[in-house]
């Protein structure tokens, strides 16, 4: 069984300003969103690391830069290594295409370079 999820949202010092503004402006919506994230995480057998990598892959497929940044940070927090994170991007090459994969690597580097 998967580990129990404490919160869907990372610490406040890691959140983008836009996210914090949304949280402040729409607290009830934010609470519902946070609860939905926790409920979906707890609904199945995936581990924290596996969930983090799956969510990263979903963000990659949507070509969402902010989400790739966020889920790269979350993958690190879940205990994933940079090599595991880069492997997810590499696996997307044949599905997303080489130019998209290069773009995703640059987004991951935005986060991973700060950790070095």
For each feature predicted by the language model, list its residue ranges.
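C-terminal structural segments of small proteins and small subunits
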Residues: 86-109
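Residues at alpha-helix boundaries and short interhelical turns
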Residues: 23, 40, 44, 61-65, ...
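Mid-chain, well-packed structural core segment of small domains
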Residues: 60-89
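Acidic, glycine/proline-rich low-complexity segments that act as flexible tails and inter-domain linkers
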Residues: 1-50, 103-116
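Short polybasic/polar patches that bind polyanions
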Residues: 42, 76, 94
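Short alpha-helical scaffolding segments that buttress acidic/His motifs in well-ordered protein cores
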Residues: 33, 37, 53-60, 88-93
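Short connector loops at helix/strand junctions that flank enzyme active sites
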Residues: 49-53, 70
């Amino acid at each position: 069984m998967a580990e129990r999820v404490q919160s869907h949202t990372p610490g406040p010092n890691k959140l983008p300003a836009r996210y914090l503004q949304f949280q402040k402006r729409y607290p009830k919506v934010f609470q519902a969103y946070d609860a939905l994230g926790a409920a979906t995480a707890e609904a199945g057998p995936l581990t924290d690391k596996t969930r983090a990598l799956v969510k990263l892959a979903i963000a990659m497929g949507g070509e969402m830069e902010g989400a790739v940044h966020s889920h790269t940070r979350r993958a690190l927090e879940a205990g994933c290594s940079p090599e595991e994170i880069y492997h997810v991007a590499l696996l997307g090459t044949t599905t997303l295409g080489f130019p998209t994969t290069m773009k995703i690597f640059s987004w991951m580097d935005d986060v991973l370079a700060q950790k070095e």
